[in-house]
Amino acid sequence: MSNRVIIFDTTLRDGEQALAASLTVKEKLQIALSLERLGVDVMEVGFPVSSPGDFESVQTIARTIKNSRVCALARALEKDIDAAAQSLSVAEQFRIHTFISTSTIHVESKLKRSFDQVLDMAVGAVKYARRFTDDVEFSCEDAGRTPIDNLCRMVEAAIKAGAKTINIPDTVGYTVPSEFGGIIQNLFDRVPNIDQAVISVHCHDDLGLSVANSITAVQHGARQIECTVNGIGERAGNCSLEEIAMIIATRKASLGLETGINAKEIHRTSNLVSQLCNMPVQANKAIVGANAFTHSSGIHQDGVLKSQNTYEIMTPESIGLNRNNLNMTSRSGRHVIKHRMEEMGYGEQDYDMDTLYEAFLKLADKKGQVFDYDLEALVYVEAQAEDENHYGLQQLVVHSDSTQGQATATVTLSIDGKAVTEAATGNGPVDAAYKAIARASGCEINISSYQLSAKGQGQDALGQVDITAKYHDQSFHGVGLATDVVEASAAALIHVMNLTWRADKVAENKHKLKQARTELGGV
């Protein structure tokens, strides 16, 4: 048996299900490209039949990614498999992942069928998917609670039908490691054709055991782990990719396993996913948390100073976290910025040097010193900028009365190239700015969440504002970055306004196309 563990990333499918606002196609592509650099073997990027937006994003990613296998999810239904195959057809290499529930509670309560009927559906789905590709994965949903006799029958039948990968999910995060390891061992002991497929696991974290269960599974013969960056996902989340990768790398002598993950890309990928998904990483999160390499105890600090491996089982550098936060000023040239970006793992294709350097100089003039984390924040915001913006912030002036708690804001917006100025009073500067923007634009945006975070250290740190807003029953995520909190807040709102404007344009175009088809059909 091979000692290579296949890393199947499902950040863009299972992970995205946990988000308050769906990612845009552009944001999904950014994450997919980062996952490709990270070295994931397979990336599951959507559920094409679920919506036109998901279909488009899967197709866009499939057309772009070259070094990882792109996968799409489909229920055990022909229409789902058709949509997956169509969206993936532009990929250099792709996989169709089809699934059906196998536990007694799911079969009887959800599917309302007999187990034999469900088995026939599974076999039919695998055979149908094989018409489009040899790389078909089949999942036994809720395998952790499926009677072992039924699970063995299902796995054997799916392999016989042509599935090359069989996934055993602990869908509700119910099992403990000894139990889950026993399930995997039973499959290897009892399924006669088990050697004809790769056994995969997909563990959820409802009891905090997803990583432990996944590691136990590979110790019993599984050779694919399904996971997400930062462990994001439904309910309590999924198995964490970075934890799996570093466990296998750090304990290689004990486990005798390896992955194809480029660990130096972990830190950057984690940051990107956290920012785009608007899901901050908890400080004490293993591997990628802010405190993961921080030592507060005097005894620990003394030990690390004497020998780093006294209290560090891996180095920050091993995950791409550079200890050298070299400060840069407005006198730093382009070559310095380019060098720092290269050291942080960014290629020239990841940013526009002219745009970045212009933003860098503006920031350096404001705060004097610019650090690595500032550059990363600037690159992130640059990447969110769209080619076509209907709204732009030209000027923002705020006056606050601390005794009354009131503030007045005057804003000048660029709306389709024309300047519009309005003023408003509110309960604090941000509220006043938002009311003035609404008055100038005529947009009524319902903000459901507002989050402020510091990007860096000290009083001159950049402030990043993330907002989630409701518009026509859809959620949109806006981000703003500035040394001034009110300015960052205004930028985040205008980002959302541009997103909603584009959504309206897309809906308008779809309506026109539908009308045109109707008229043609009537001729």
From Swiss-Prot:
Main location as per UniProt: cytoplasm
Substrates-to-products reaction catalysed: 3-methyl-2-oxobutanoate + acetyl-CoA + H2O = (2S)-2-isopropylmalate + CoA + H(+)
The Pyruvate carboxyltransferase domain, residue ranges: 5-267
Enzyme class, UniProt record, top EC level: transferase
One cellular component (GO) term of this entry: cytosol
Pathway(s) it belongs to: Amino-acid biosynthesis; L-leucine biosynthesis; L-leucine from 3-methyl-2-oxobutanoate: step 1/4
Metal-binding as UniProt keyword: yes
Keywords of the record: Amino-acid biosynthesis, Branched-chain amino acid biosynthesis, Cytoplasm, Leucine biosynthesis, Manganese, Metal-binding, Transferase
Region Regulatory domain, annotated ranges: 392-523
Annotated coiled-coil segments of the chain: none
CDD domains in UniProt: DRE_TIM_IPMS
EC number(s) from the headed UniProt entry: 2.3.3.13
Similarity field: Belongs to the alpha-IPM synthase/homocitrate synthase family. LeuA type 1 subfamily.
Binding partners and assembly: Homodimer.
Protein's UniProt name: 2-isopropylmalate synthase
Organism: Shewanella loihica (strain ATCC BAA-1088 / PV-4)
Lineage: Bacteria, Pseudomonadati, Pseudomonadota, Gammaproteobacteria, Alteromonadales
